[in-house]
Amino acid sequence: MTGDAPQSAPQHRGSPAPAHVPVMLERVVELLAPALQQPGAIAVDGTLGLGGHAEALLRAHPGLRLVGVDRDTTALERARQRLAPYADRIDLVHAVYSDIPRILDELGIDRVHGLLFDLGVSSPQLDEAERGFAYSYDAPLDMRMDRTQERTAADIVNTYPASELTRIFRVYGEERFAARIAQAIVRQRAKEPVRTTGVLADLVRSAIPAAARRSGGHPAKRAFQALRIEVNSELSILERALPAALSRLAVAGRIVVLSYHSLEDRITKRVLTELSTDSTPPGLPVPLPDRQPELRLLTRGAELPTEQETAANPRAASARLRAAERTREP
């Protein structure tokens, strides 16, 4: 993993304020189209954000019913306003996308025909200083995607032992100076709690050797990514969410996943690859029907945005797209 893009081009689902440019929009719509053209098609956007992808899908498929899920109540309300012309065809739900099976049960939906996951942090979360996601602002150290949850980045920074902070920075941020950063935080909080993004960014910068700060973007980018992942349990939720959502995908239904760093992409690749592989034990004379692939991969590896898109929308630069189609019942 190369880490987050610089703050001027961070990983996430949109573009600099005030515009919102959905990442790889045309490709997402193209990949999902064959599954959504049938009468009565239902799609789930598990990371609704500001609703850019959802709007394009609803416009492209006049008979489509769309379930939009987001853990951020602010984003959900903005998406509701954006999607108001399609109000009779949408169900918007405040939830984490690992809850998709429960949500579908409550809506009386058995199978869906399209699944979309656009991972990472959204434009408003990065652009609104008070959310505490960005190291370019001095703001309360928050980083909660869902502000109804209690634990913040400040809670983690000020209460986790040095060993656990080191693990988070090393595993989630792939930060080679994880231990030095953790020790700097522990020393600082012994004097005064670390409460703001500015203080944390300065601590991280001072903990990293000067030679290592000369390249690779802002020195705090990996540490901030790691804390955000820990605050929001992003990877553990993704691990649960993909198999859970795929269990409700109809035959010939399609899934598209956009990820923005290698940890997300690694999980996505593993889940889709496992379900697209024949798991018949070696040595058997014939394949076992229940061990045949459930999915067919639609992308060769991870697809990248075009140079034209990244030039117009730098925040798309780190995007990686994978897609698959269900070929049999699970």
UniProtKB/Swiss-Prot annotation:
GO biological process: rRNA base methylation
Keywords of this entry: Cytoplasm, Methyltransferase, rRNA processing, S-adenosyl-L-methionine, Transferase
Binding site for S-adenosyl-L-methionine: 51-53, 70, 118, 125
InterPro entries with a match to the protein in the record: RsmH (IPR002903), SAM-dep_MeTrfase_MraW_recog (IPR023397), SAM-dependent_MTases_sf (IPR029063)
Highest taxon in the source lineage: Bacteria
EC numbers, comma separated: 2.1.1.199
Start and end residues of each stretch annotated as Disordered: 276-330
Protein's UniProt keywords contain Electron transport: no
GO molecular function: rRNA (cytosine-N4-)-methyltransferase activity
Catalytic reaction equation(s): cytidine(1402) in 16S rRNA + S-adenosyl-L-methionine = N(4)-methylcytidine(1402) in 16S rRNA + S-adenosyl-L-homocysteine + H(+)
SUPFAM superfamilies linked: Putative methyltransferase TM0872, insert domain, S-adenosyl-L-methionine-dependent methyltransferases
Cellular compartments per GO CC: cytoplasm
Bias (Low complexity) ranges: 311-321
Locations listed in the record: Cytoplasm
Pfam families: Methyltransf_5 (PF01795)
Biological function: Specifically methylates the N4 position of cytidine in position 1402 (C1402) of 16S rRNA.
Protein family per UniProt: Belongs to the methyltransferase superfamily. RsmH family.
Protein name according to UniProt: Ribosomal RNA small subunit methyltransferase H
Gene label: rsmH
